[in-house]
From Swiss-Prot:
Keywords: Cytoplasm, Fatty acid biosynthesis, Fatty acid metabolism, Lipid biosynthesis, Lipid metabolism, Phosphopantetheine, Phosphoprotein. Belongs to the acyl carrier protein (ACP) family. Pathway: Lipid metabolism; fatty acid biosynthesis. 4'-phosphopantetheine is transferred from CoA to a specific serine of apo-ACP by AcpS. This modification is essential for activity because fatty acids are bound in thioester linkage to the sulfhydryl of the prosthetic group. This is Acyl carrier protein. SMART domains: PKS_PP (SM00823). The gene is acpP. NCBIfam families: acyl_carrier (TIGR00517), PRK00982.1-2 (NF002148), PRK00982.1-3 (NF002149), PRK00982.1-4 (NF002150), PRK00982.1-5 (NF002151). GO terms for cellular component: cytosol; membrane.
Length: 78
């Protein structure tokens, strides 16, 4: 697992209060991890803060799984 993936996973565990074992690449924030729309917005904000990036709303809407988040951040992190 990459450093970015590990950091993303840690943020999700912290913010959603889920078990680390539940946070898989394929896990959907809403369907698998129980996030609501506010939780998802807060996750995006945490990713922006943690990685020093800005995620436009149109891109944030496409980030629905742990893998989506990791891929986006890996492609856009400074």
């Amino acid at each position: 697992m990459s450093e970015i993936a590990s950091r993303v996973k840690a943020i999700i565990v912290d913010k959603l209060g889920v078990e680390e074992s539940e946070v898989t690449t394929e896990a959907s924030f809403t369907n698998d991890l129980g996030a609501d729309s506010l939780d998802t917005v807060e996750l995006i904000m945490e990713f922006e803060k943690e990685f020093g990036i800005s995620i436009p709303d149109d891109q944030a809407e496409k980030i629905g799984t742990v893998g989506d988040a990791v891929s986006y951040i890996e492609a856009n992190a400074k």
